[in-house]
Amino acid sequence: KADAISKYDGQLTFSYNADSGAKPLYDAVVNQLKNNLGIDAATNPIPTFQEFRDAVTNRQMKGAFRTGWQPDYPSAENYLWQLYSTAAADGNGSNDGDYKSPAFDDLCKQAAAASSTDDANKLYQQAEEILLNDLPAIPLYYSNASGVASLNVKSGYAFDWQNRSEE
């Protein structure tokens, strides 16, 4: 189906910073694409996070590359606007793929001006539908924090909305 939409010739590369410990993950992605879909894929490890970010910031990446985001506050806006708005593209923010959609931007602006959180979230969900159709990024994995609990433990750790521990 993908070839019917847009034929792709050549090798698909996945760049990541080699000092992250993510090699097994990207090797697995490449092997899945090769073995299951017959896509010529390869990893492109970049030695350090600094070199990796410099290449992303300077728009020197070829092919797919890893990104990540940790929200500053618990709101859809902190993900959507920061990562996909036109205002955050072209080196002006964290829209590293330089995605641009006036319809997406308009919905996010309406959501930011909404009079209630529920109204804002409905608009953000509509904006997410645009992202789902345009697919400017493909989530490959999500990092989680793990914890255990027991009635026999009197104090311990709790995790906040950013998966950071609180004592």
What are these regions (language model features)?
Residues 1-31, 35, 126:
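Append "and occasionally in soluble cytosolic enzymes with long acidic Gly/Pro-rich linkers
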Residues 3-8, 54-60, 81-109, 113, ...:
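Short, solvent-exposed loop/beta-turn-alpha elements that line the ligand-binding surface or hinge
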Residues 34-88:
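Periplasmic binding protein-like
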Residues 24-31, 35, 50, 54, ...:
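Solvent-exposed, polar/charged alpha-helical surfaces in well-ordered, non-transmembrane soluble domains
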Residues 28, 126, 133, 159-167:
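Small-molecule-sensing regulatory modules
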Residues 18-22, 49-50, 70-74, 130, ...:
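Solvent-exposed loop/turn segments at secondary-structure junctions
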Residues 12-16, 42-44, 63-67, 138-141:
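Structural recognition of the beta-strand scaffold that forms the well-ordered cores
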Residues 19-27, 46, 94, 98-102, ...:
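Soluble non-cytosolic domains of exported or imported proteins
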